[in-house]
């Protein structure tokens, strides 16, 4: 919007101030015959002009609940062979410094073919996200059921809640999210909320597997994360800052949580207390490393797949399934042993009572006969 012109390549990233409009112009070839053009808006308002006439527009100012930018999604513009030789102008506007000046791939062709290509390239992460989502729901419900049956708590419930947050984040970052929900802005906002809540979920889970040794430390982390969530959400709701602008605050809190978790792991390893939860510790370290890679990638790539976080969550899931099965086996073994001991003690008490009754009967007969018989002596020896 400052009037500067330059030749660009698509896709690409260019120096545009947040809030300024980047205008891309080109002349459609004479043999143009596509019926649709499409581009992915990355937190951008998009307008298509053909021969100076507005053909398509994507702007969520009237539908988004809060924020200054439109949620990322694919924007389609209907075209025809009659547009051949006409000027095409695409306007991109974003208030986010990470996305102003971003130009994604422009697609031409049939709408179904474009969606097929998008689905082919992006379906893997979405399928993983749905798998994690349903696995999380099953994990939480199964853990609650086990807790009721065995009258004890299972850490897998906390894993389920962490997985649920991760699945929501992955679905929110999915390139197919506009096919999943009618209002992509709400789902996009949930991605940032998940990052703000994550330190709380991670702290609760780690504190549980560590047996509450560092409850005070994790309580402080949870309190700080809750305050951070309230402050950031308030800034978003009152239009002071968008989530994307204060994202470093949430990522910083998550990084602090990770540092605390790693520190407690090191302390437990030094003091030989980590053996009790070694599988969970290894899985958590792998997941934390992958989550930090995913969180940091927002500053280097335009779109995130969620593949790293999904992989980390699946690792934690399978490790906790194994740990839970082992714990159930131990509980069952202990229960069966207690039941066996109870039955043995009960049998011994019944046998002792029978012998006492028999002895009393023999003694009564002895008193009646006023003498000891060989059989009385024999029974007495057995009882003794």
Report residues per predicted region:
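Juxtamembrane interface at the cytosolic side of transmembrane helices
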Residues: 138-168
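Beta-strand-rich ligand-recognition modules
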Residues: 46, 50-87, 92-104
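First transmembrane helix
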Residues: 110, 116-150, 248-270, 310
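Acidic/His-rich, divalent-metal-binding segments that scaffold phosphate/diphosphate chemistry
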Residues: 333-384
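Accessory carbohydrate-binding/adhesion or oligomerization-edge regions at the termini
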Residues: 1-13, 91-120
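Extended carbohydrate-recognition surfaces in non-catalytic/accessory domains of CAZymes
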Residues: 1-31
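Interfacial "cap-and-anchor" motif at the non-cytosolic start of specific transmembrane alpha-helices
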Residues: 167-342
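Aromatic-lined ligand-binding clefts that engage carbohydrates, nucleic acids, or primary amines
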Residues: 27-50, 88-90
